[in-house]
Structure formats: structure tokens, C-alpha cells
């Protein structure tokens, strides 16, 4: 059986191909919501199309959140459903299964990790409703232990301030992180921290940005960025502490868009015995996670279990 894990319609698209429980192909295309040529390359990797398409999120559940947020154009848009993707890529003969967004993240990390047991932490802007989750990976299973839901989101908090500072949200958060290195966090720390009522819970939704802050001048930008990075770190610290208390396992798998914050990640080795993440912990590699959830197996290459994912052997 050939299973495709797929992510799409998030400005990028990716496909992972599993045949007979072996990972045969993975490729990520930037800047395209859909790419039929990528599908053709995936077909060539196994000389056949998919029997099953494993979608990285549950789009109908996502639409309930979009309705809650008043995003009615998104709710009515049927062109972003997996069936529409399959038709455009000429693989609409395949069965389609869907998996929760955060569970796809968690599976991409845990099922390619060197650990038989791990604490799995997923933090991003938003999935269907989940924005941060803690999982216990053990005996080939993932059990959700805790979650934070929209509109509370550390990822959206960081993206909102990315926009305030003149960068592109969900794309240029790394520029805020770099700018923070040149700032004084104490100047604006209290004001930035006040957006949280208590750990992981925002006072107001920041999905559409920070609207109660004047446009910062050049002198203030670095100090605001430094404060945002400091508050972000404090919030992730709380999640990491909660994660260990839930699982009592000192092996960490950390994935999701927020796991790309390299400045924070330096702290992880002080908090955990062993730490693992995938080369791209954001949405694209959730294609691998969705495929592995469908096969209910750890990743294998050439019949051997993957103990540390190396993308160069997949594409």
C-alpha cells in the first residue's frame, strides 16, 4: 500500500510517501499552496499513485474555528479541502483520511526520534483549535496530556508583534528574534507581558495583530522585540515545566512553528536530559507525521527504523 502524507494551502506544500512502511520520498515546495508537479515527482518515487492520502489537519474542524473568528470567506471556501487538492493533482481516486494538526506535528517528531518514550511539546500559531499541546509518546502511541486553545496562542502573540515591527507575520518571525538581540527587554517588558492574564492565556485575541500600540519608532523597535522574546521565553518555560510534570519523562521532542525560535532552544539542554527536533519543525514536515499516523508505525528507511531523520536521503 502506498500512503501519501500531505500538507497544503499554508503558502507551502509538501508530500511524504510511505510504501510498505518505508519512507520513500519527502519534498517541500515553498511559496505554493498546491503544486501538481510535486505530485508527479511523488508518483515517480514509487512508480504508482497513492492508495491513501493522509491529510495533516482536519479541515471541517478548522472551519468551526474560522466561523468562531468571523472568517466567513474562509468558512465558505471549498477549494482548500483535501478533495480539491487531490482533484487538482489528479490523484482523486485515493481514499482520504485526516488527522488533527497538532497530532501530525507530534507524530512527525516522535516517530522519527531516537526515543522509545518521550515528552512531546507542540507550540505554533494555530492548528484547528489547538495552539499548544503536550503529548506522552510511549509504546508507539501518542497520548494528549494537555492543550491550550484559540484564541489563546503564544505563536499568534509572537506573530502579532512581528507585524507591529514591520515584518511579515508567519514568515519573518526570525527577524524579530534577531532584532531582539540588540534591545533592552526591561523597557517594555511589563507592557508586553500584560497581554497575558496568566500562563498561555491572553487578555485579548491577537489574531489580527496588536492594535492598541502606536507604531514604534526606530529607537524603540529593538527594545520591543527584546521584551517580546523575553515574554515568549517565559511562556514556553511554563509549558516545558508543565510538560515534564505531566509525563515525568526527561526526553523531549519539540515541534511546531515556535520550535524554530533558536534563541529559546538554547535553554532546552539545561532543562531536559535529551532533546530532539526535526529539520523543519513547522507545518511542512507534518506530511511525514500524517503518513506515519496512518500506518501506525515509526519511520523506516530501507527497512530500518529511523533514529534521526535526515532529509537528504528522502528527496
Regions found by a protein language model. Name each.
Residues 1-315:
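Short acidic/glycine-rich loops and adjacent helix/strand connectors
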